[in-house]
């Protein structure tokens, strides 16, 4: 099976915890704090690999987590950084955040790397919290949690030219005659169930990658047949070869076939309607009907498209098509990768949000406050006091009071619960 979609979970490594330690050595009076910092968590990085051509591996492994940073230790020793996790994906993979659809990366080049989930920073050891009023602080930070998110992966094959047309128009025969690709060929619809790629040599004019796009029928843009699954693979192409059954061996009108397929392309993505296209009028070896329909094709589309009579089965006319395609490709620009949207205007997030859960308890959300709570040693009184000061400076205490919190109420922040008291 050909898998071009996957949903996976990734998480950057958590930062290592900072250490609470005191220096206790002979001849060193008032040794003071000596706790080291935690190491930075590892990143989850995707790397494009041209040796891969499917997302099938992600059917069996869906969770990817980088190594956490090492914890700080006494004697002011810092923990080691966590190892980054490299995840190989096929070239042509588009990475989006599953919840929002936000584009994160479009990996087009072999070896291209993108950090998908950053590791958390290491927590600071208590050596950082010494002051004139607190020379032996029992304050340190736990490691910052690494970024985590669910991703939608979508593979769009990378080819210079796409072969489009109705089932049984002869696309698979075409690609098998001009390249080393060996698609399944049979006399029934939907023989081809996966996009087949082949490298085509045009002599001195160079070579190009050709993709046989299967499953295009009327209604494909709305999911009819297999077209909805494979139309995305036309997006990377720079030029389209529209293969049509000129002889009408399947009982269809070749003129209407071209109109239908082009309408489906435009409905799926209006940009495809402007993609350069040539018509390969196939099955010209079946006469006289093919010759009559060729004249109709030229009358209907001659001013809009270049039309080449061919017979893929007998190799008739294929060389002319290939050399013309190579000439056109030399004049066409490369398809640019999708770019993540950039915020034009900076809009600061609210520092926190307060709401009441269905059970009557309070829930506080916000990246900053949740990070502070996650990085606090709540079992240490001094660390807890520091967190309370931070909450007060952020305005959280006043916010809860204004929201109506009462003594004894439970306030949830992240994974922790606190009982409200005066």
UniProtKB/Swiss-Prot annotation:
Alphabetized UniProt keyword annotations: Cytoplasm, GTP-binding, Hydrolase, Magnesium, Metal-binding, Nucleotide-binding
Listed EC numbers: 3.6.5.-
PROSITE patterns according to UniProt: G_OBG, GTP1_OBG, OBG, OCT
Cofactor: Mg(2+)
GO molecular function, one term: magnesium ion binding
Binding site for Mg(2+): 172, 192
Class of enzymatic activity (EC top level): hydrolase
A Gene Ontology term for the protein's cellular component: cytoplasm
InterPro entries, sorted: G_OBG, GTP-bd, GTP-bd_Obg/CgtA, GTP-bd_prot_GTP1/OBG_C_sf, GTP1-OBG_CS, GTP1_OBG_dom, GTP1_OBG_dom_sf, OBG_GTPase
Location(s), subcellular: Cytoplasm
Binding site for GTP: 165-172, 190-194, 212-215, 282-285, 311-313
One BP term from GO: ribosome biogenesis
Main location as per UniProt: cytoplasm
Ranges of residues in domain OCT: 344-422
Organism superkingdom: Bacteria
Record family assignment: Belongs to the TRAFAC class OBG-HflX-like GTPase superfamily. OBG GTPase family.
Assembly: Monomer.
PANTHER family membership: DEVELOPMENTALLY REGULATED GTP-BINDING PROTEIN-RELATED, MITOCHONDRIAL RIBOSOME-ASSOCIATED GTPASE 2
Function as written in the Swiss-Prot or TrEMBL entry: An essential GTPase which binds GTP, GDP and possibly (p)ppGpp with moderate affinity, with high nucleotide exchange rates and a fairly low GTP hydrolysis rate. Plays a role in control of the cell cycle, stress response, ribosome biogenesis and in those bacteria that undergo differentiation, in morphogenesis control.
Protein name: GTPase Obg
Organism: Desulforamulus reducens (strain ATCC BAA-1160 / DSM 100696 / MI-1)
